[in-house]
């Protein structure tokens, strides 16, 4: 079994099946997803703990990124996608026809596998979402840039070149810039889809340390193929296989005493 970082808050395990509303960031209820005639997710039910890091793990094609993209309705950009069931955020189903998708994505930010800064300056990357919200006052924008870059552990590295093109940053710096851009609009939930898969080991470690800091202000959900990474950074772990949620528990339990044989087989390398 993998060792779990004891600094990740695992000594106060939550009963995820009966997580109270005040400790729940969102709940997923009876979620199915189809791409055309192909079903990709099957009856997913889970409560995401507020202010913690939850990881989705499983073999390629198991549905973990698909589930992640349901949480801010990114899957709707795929032709033929149909979602049934509910994802409740503060008592409202995000799939309700009355929900404004742009507003939802401000509340639920997302960072993708490869760094995707805009072809703009570092400064303009960070304030992009704020400008879309109509913020124009320079002092407010300046404060937001510093706060967000500090929150992404990047300020000290770029504070003297904020107006240089973001493409001049290293890959790891670009990914932290993307995180700064995401948190500048102060989301409630931050989704990370394999955020270190394109980075070198040193940049990966920096991002992992950042994730631990981010959970003090945001609920973080991360998809990762790297089981060691899930063990290091997350408080809760969900194991998925063939579109099903096989097991969902504290990271400590998943990696040391899994209840399901499929979970044990995966984390011990018998398949995946």
Curated annotation (Swiss-Prot):
Q: Which organism is it from?
A: Photobacterium profundum (strain SS9)
* NCBIfam families cross-referenced by the UniProt entry: 3a0107s01c2
SMART domains reported for this sequence: AAA
Question: Whom does it interact with, and what assembly results?
Answer: The complex is composed of two ATP-binding proteins (PstB), two transmembrane proteins (PstC and PstA) and a solute-binding protein (PstS).
Its EC number(s):
7.3.2.1
Name the family the entry cites: Belongs to the ABC transporter superfamily. Phosphate importer (TC 3.A.1.7) family.
Family annotation (CDD domains): ABC_PstB_phosphate_transporter (cd03260)
Record's protein name: Phosphate import ATP-binding protein PstB 1
Q: Which reaction does it catalyse?
A: phosphate(out) + ATP + H2O = ADP + 2 phosphate(in) + H(+)
Domain annotation ABC transporter: ranges:
26-267
Q: Biological process GO annotation list? A: phosphate ion transmembrane transport
A Pfam family (short name) is ABC_tran
Mitochondrion listed as a keyword: no
State the compartments where it is located.
Cell inner membrane
Binding residues annotated for ATP, in chain numbering = 58-65
Q: Which Gene3D superfamilies match?
A: P-loop containing nucleotide triphosphate hydrolases
């Amino acid at each position: 079994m993998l060792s779990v970082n004891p600094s990740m808050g695992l000594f106060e395990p939550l009963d995820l099946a009966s997580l109270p509303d005040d400790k729940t960031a969102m709940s997923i209820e009876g979620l199915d997803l189809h791409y055309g005639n192909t079903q990709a997710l099957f009856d997913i039910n889970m409560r995401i703990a507020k202010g913690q890091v939850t990881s989705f793990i499983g073999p390629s094609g198991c549905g973990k990124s698909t589930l992640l993209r349901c949480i801010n309705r990114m899957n709707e950009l795929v032709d033929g996608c149909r979602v049934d069931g509910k994802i409740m955020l503060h008592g409202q189903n995000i799939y309700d026809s009355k929900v404004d998708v742009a507003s939802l994505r401000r509340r639920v930010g997302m960072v993708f596998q490869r760094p995707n800064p805009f072809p703009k300056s570092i400064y303009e990357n960070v304030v992009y979402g704020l400008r879309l919200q109509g913020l124009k006052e320079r002092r407010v924008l300046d404060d937001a840039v510093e706060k967000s870059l500090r929150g992404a552990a990047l300020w000290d590295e770029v504070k003297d070149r904020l107006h240089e093109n973001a493409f001049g940053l290293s890959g790891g710096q670009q990914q932290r810039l993307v995180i700064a851009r995401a948190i500048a609009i102060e989301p409630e939930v931050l989704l990370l889809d394999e955020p270190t898969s394109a980075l070198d080991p040193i940049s990966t470690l920096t991002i992992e340390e950042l994730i631990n800091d981010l959970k003090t202000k945001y609920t973080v959900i991360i998809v990762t193929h790297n089981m060691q990474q899930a063990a290091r950074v997350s408080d809760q772990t969900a194991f998925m296989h063939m579109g099903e949620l096989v097991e969902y528990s504290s990271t400590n339990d998943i990696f040391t005493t899994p209840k399901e044989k499929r979970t044990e087989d995966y984390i011990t390398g018998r398949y995946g």
